[in-house]
């Protein structure tokens, strides 16, 4: 009841506004009278009155501009206040606009008292011609308007008999009356009462929620059916094993009592054991009386799967390919780009994919090792949207692979081309989001980070993040992840300090965004930039600690720990030596040991498809572009340098969203630590928190006067080397600080917890060779997992917010 009383006046005002809008005057009088009797106060100045006054003001301005012949003012107001849908689809609005264009075109001829302003007259006629060629072209087939298409070409329209009517005062007066009537109806419809707006929004939201729930229901039912089948299978196998076990126990007891086990009995037991994997006749044909046969078959059924040799793709004529990519027609370019991308995305991880990538690099497919004006990178500026998109997708695949990032970093003009393409593309285009993904992956390379910071890309990203609701989930995640990677550098933090107030406001707003997957990147960026004293002071002055503590109440335990670290950073007094660039100056190592990460939906929703007689994919490459000995293969060392960062701590190393998801997946799938380990970690964390107000590093609390967070991040260690100073992290090898653990524990745990994607493991399974003893039987036994996998799905919610993926 208290809630109703609190909002009662507003609710009564909404009802009053709606009744007034619908012209229910008698009902409104009765309603007002009854409210007065019951002591209910109606708002004196309702939203309706304000809207009505605003509508009248707009209408007055339009009529004034009409009478004065002010064409610019009139059509500026017209475009602003008349809905676009009404302008494009309403026949009354289209006809009225046509006559209004005529009115303004001949206005100087009607109002001139003597000398005519020829310049003004020519400008108006030119404007009218432009209208006839664009918006007015739709009415060119209408008999009523057909004569007026000759108006701009008549030297003296006032003297022409065909246009005599429009120069009469009655015509202008009638047009003004039609305009007033139209504006009163349209502007009133535009000022919809709040009650109707609330109803429409609620209805729209309910429909969206219903669709989401229906989709979730279908997925859940499908999973339930799958799980039920698995359960029934497991239950059947379990009962079968219990029965076989009971029979074997009876046999052992009989053996103790001196009874012999017959071959027929052993045959029946083995047949029951293998009945699920083998046909009955096949199982009965095997000689189980031979010693070791049954046990060998059992062991073989759970033996690790052996991988077959994967054939390499044929060599290509890359010179001809690059020539056709530059000078061919747009459709051919698109098919070539698609086929080259498919070679990478549809190849088997390992030798086959590495050979394809090395062939692209050694033959300089993207012209990253040369700086000719006419190279493949000009396709990013192609007038064809399909070519631009497919070019970006091919570069994105290369940027998803460790060697590919090294190769792309060799061209200093590539970054400039990518940034220009990103800025030039429309906000909801696939090409724009793909280019954003490329920039984010390239930000794993220290040289590319430096170039991006130098080009002030940080401020572009901040402007993008000002309005996150207009970004798809994919664009939002990759934008904030790129921003965080750049903020981890000393130069990036310095740049943020120039506009600290703006940056902090944008990040604090993102803390409350409904997409919780971005919280880790927001936390990492905040923690990093708060190392700068000037930014800390700005954050304190705007009450950042109160904002953060409010989110602690709302967040999950992991995020709460992140925020606690950020608050410690905010309240610290550590100095930030701007002259020290130790981590920025250190030599960058190639990230060849990084795990490669190909996103799952790179080949979804292909725009072009081969028609009858056209070649595409591998068939196109091997038919028209077959080469000789252009493949080169470099053995790629797999060094799982990544360690799992503590879930308590904000990100402090460059990551991609796919790598972060992989890290979280591994953390969730890993076994829970024992109580003893938990106690040990808790005690270590307590000791560290007592010794320093800053988040601890593996070397303890740092000196507050000289070390920066950059140097803290650069001292991270891997299972293979405790002095690894690489500045970039592979998309599937997150190598971030582990909090509160001894070195040997971190090393051991990191070897066991290797980030990988369950989806990709299924997608990249190889054909298996049949063991020499017997076929593989068990499909549920222990399997040897292959670690050469790509990252998990990028969850490109482009599809959730954009028409092309929606």
From Swiss-Prot:
SUPFAM superfamilies tied to this protein: ARM repeat
Keywords on record: Cell projection, Cilium biogenesis/degradation, Coiled coil, Cytoplasm, Cytoskeleton
Primary site of residence: cytoplasm
Protein name per the record: LisH domain-containing protein ARMC9
PANTHER family, per database record: LISH DOMAIN-CONTAINING PROTEIN ARMC9 (PTHR14881:SF4)
S-S bridge residues: none
Job description of the protein: Involved in ciliogenesis. It is required for appropriate acetylation and polyglutamylation of ciliary microtubules, and regulation of cilium length. Acts as a positive regulator of hedgehog (Hh)signaling.
Organism from which the protein derives: Xenopus laevis (African clawed frog)
Ranges of compositional bias, category Polar residues: 655-688, 759-782
Biased segments, Acidic residues type: 579-604
GO biological process annotation, one example: positive regulation of smoothened signaling pathway
Sequence ranges assigned to domain LisH in this UniProt record: 7-39
Pfam families reported for this sequence: ARMC9_ARM, ARMC9_LisH, CTLH_Armc9
